[in-house]
Amino acid sequence: EGCCSNPPCRHTHPEVC
């Protein structure tokens, strides 16, 4: 859920995960 489960967002904001 959130940025971590959205591949494009996760790639853009890896620090979130």
From Swiss-Prot:
This is Alpha-conotoxin In1878. Expressed by the venom duct. It holds the Pfam family Toxin_8. It comes from Conus inscriptus (Engraved cone). Its main location: secreted. It comes from the Eukaryota. Alpha-conotoxins act on postsynaptic membranes, they bind to the nicotinic acetylcholine receptors (nAChR) and thus inhibit them. It is found in: Secreted. Disulfide bonds join C3-C9, C4-C17. The modification 4-hydroxyproline is found at P8. One of its GO terms (molecular function) is acetylcholine receptor inhibitor activity. Residues 5-7 are annotated as: Ser-Xaa-Pro motif, crucial for potent interaction with nAChR. Coiled coil: none annotated. The cysteine framework is I (CC-C-C). Alpha4/7 pattern.
